Amino acid sequence: MKLYIHKDIFYPDAWWVKFKWLFDKKYKDINYEIVNLHYENNINDLQIGNDDYCICRFGHYEEDFELSKRVYPLLYEKFNGRIWPNKEDWYYYNNKKRQLEFFEKNNVPHPISHYSYGREDFTEWVNENNLEYPIVVKKSQGAGSEEVDLVYEKEYSWYDEVNRKKKFFDETDWDVIDFPSIIQQYIDVDYDIRIAFINNKVLFLKRFHQWKTKNKDNFPYGTDKKPIEKKLKYKLAPYEEPRCESLDEKEILKLLPIVNYLHDKFNTISIGWDIIGDIENFKVLEFSYIFQNELRDCKSYYDMKTKEIKNLDYDKRLEFTFIQNEILKSIKEISYGS
């Protein structure tokens, strides 16, 4: 088996550097090549064996995503489906409309939601579902909490000359919405939970919603904007990371029925689900394959093989190749059955 690793040139924290480190230090028996797979000529020139495998880190940075959309079908065909992210992972990545369709098709609990094309459609949906403002609005494309806002009703007033009194009416603040968008029931919670399946490990992270007391422009996490120079240089999300907290063993045990439920719905090498609520009334907000070491705050994980909760020691949590290592272990298991 030979591995072909995408040279993700758009990001200073390039994945291929981390993979190269792993190959040189830990997986010396694996033959590999680093290739910029954004270009069709590079893909066409590859001499692929029957068991060769492709690993791509395609992010949601606009230029990267547009190039990736063009070449992914070619890569999938070239490697006969032996590619990470797989076809299903890629289909739902960065596309909240498709994720909503997945929820509806598979009866996954989620907030009342709708893909809205305009004002009339928006108003009709709010009234039909007897929803109260605010309403959550999400761009149909975008990862995580980017492009997510709360929409309120604005109060308008005018003076009635005939009756000589001031009158008022409320109307949706349309300026906040860029149609078409996902519109969603607002559920007031203090935090959400990221449940991340990485190979056979399940990690949990509580992320606090602080928009009410901190930065109200950043719903729901309330963190400050990143310096523009840093954001542009490293192709980062616009806001700082939310305040996070690891779950203790009791909290994890309570979530295991949800873990098994989600695993049955979508079983893949690396995927993260954002949920709110508990086992009695949990709802899924969105999901996506994971390519970032975003779970460094986790202190433990659930082992899907042994059905045990295990400690994740400090060095492991900070290991900069954690996700890359788990992906390689999973691919070796698929290829060699060990």
State each model region's role:
Residues 240-253, 264-268, 277-338:
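C-terminal active-site "lid" helix and adjoining low-complexity regulatory extension at the edge
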Residues 150-254:
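Phosphate-binding site of ATP-dependent enzymes
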Residues 9-115, 124:
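Conserved N-proximal alpha/beta basic substrate-recognition cap immediately N-terminal to
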Residues 115, 197-198, 277:
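Generic beta-strand structural signal
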Residues 135, 182, 203-204, 271, ...:
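Protein kinase-like catalytic core scaffold
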Residues 136, 276-277:
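Conserved protein-kinase catalytic-loop segment immediately C-terminal to the catalytic Asp
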Residues 59-62, 140-142, 290:
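Short glycine-rich anion-binding loops that position phosphate/pyrophosphate groups of nucleotides
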Residues 4-6, 90-181, 252-253:
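Active-site nucleotide/adenylate-binding loops and adjacent lid/helix of ATP-dependent enzymes
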